[in-house]
Amino acid sequence: MNVKEHVISLPRRVFVGHDIIYDISIYFSQLGITSPFLIVTGTKYTKKIADRVIENLPKNAKYEVIEIDTATLDDVYKVEEVVKKVNPNILLGIGGGKVIDVTKYAAFRNNLEFVSIPTSPSHDGITSPFASIKGLQKPVSVKAKEPLAIIADIEILSLSPRRLINAGIGDTIGKIIAVRDWRLAAKLRGEYYGDYTASLALMSAKHAFQCTKIINKDIKYGVRMLIEALISSGVAMGMAGSTRPASGSEHLFAHAVELLHPEGVLHGELVGLGTIIMAYLHGINWKIIRDRLKKIGFPVKAKDLGLSDEEVIKALTIAHTIRPERYTILGDRGLTWSSAEKIARVTKIID
């Protein structure tokens, strides 16, 4: 497959360490970042982290803060209104997946740089040049701005709720399926397949898989492993120029459930369930994936997430329609209701 131009979008600098939030002014100086800043953050815990960031900004820095708690197009518009008022040099996204997604999409739409400062290791959007924004045509990722820099403070990340940490593990292990789906599409449809980016995504998944052995014993070391895996996954997407290395049938299932059951479930939790199911379809050892996730307290049954059997089965039957241009193990026609029910029961997602 001949491609005239392939653009790789990567962060310029990645800072990972303990208590590094106190060195933000040094990092900004190294990168030539100057105020005014527009800080995008959440409304609760993440706002407290944002306050600590503000305390450590360069002396006399000018800044404005906007708080959001969802990742909708309306939230993006709210940020853009403040952008017009403040005319910032750069955006700082301080929060979880929703905050960082809104920040990077607003940065993309307004031709601005942004710095990613995650407060939970729940998503690989920390690094990637893609965002998931509700209110667009479909519940899939759209092109956004890659971060100029990432500042990942292990002390902060390891204090995030365990449910969010587990969701990050579920999201990252899913790359095992994404890469297999990508390889399948290359073989059957002649789709472009990047060996290097696929290997990087797969390495991220294996790293997260190893994390399941450590996280219960040493939370900080486990979170460091996880954040490195999440960052690598985001880099793989930036190198591929698409979400292909990190999003396959397991993500299609997650997006389908989100359409049917839009509230109360974390994206990474749904990806984890989808990974178990799609591992079965790919003929790989789904039991070991399920067992590893279960040992860290990950919800491996639909009912643990408040999902009905019907929602799971329905999601499996419509998953292939979420991104029909993206070929996966689900094929063009998807699964019948009876097949979907059988697979969900065999993998113990439903009883």
Curated annotation (Swiss-Prot):
Enzyme Commission designation: 1.1.1.261
One GO CC term on file: cytoplasm
Details of cofactor binding: Binds 1 zinc ion per subunit.
Reaction(s) this enzyme catalyzes, per UniProt: sn-glycerol 1-phosphate + NAD(+) = dihydroxyacetone phosphate + NADH + H(+); sn-glycerol 1-phosphate + NADP(+) = dihydroxyacetone phosphate + NADPH + H(+)
Localisation per UniProt entry: Cytoplasm
Gene Ontology terms: biological process: glycerophospholipid metabolic process; phospholipid biosynthetic process
Keywords: Cytoplasm, Lipid biosynthesis, Lipid metabolism, Metal-binding, NAD, NADP, Oxidoreductase, Phospholipid biosynthesis, Phospholipid metabolism, Zinc
Superkingdom of origin organism: Archaea
Xref: InterPro entries: G1P_dehydrogenase_arc, G1PDH, Glycerol_DH
Subunit structure: Homodimer.
NCBIfam families with a match to the protein in the record: PRK00843.1
Protein known as: Glycerol-1-phosphate dehydrogenase [NAD(P)+]
Annotated source species: Saccharolobus islandicus (strain Y.G.57.14 / Yellowstone #1)
Lineage of origin: Archaea, Thermoproteota, Thermoprotei, Sulfolobales, Sulfolobaceae
Gene: egsA
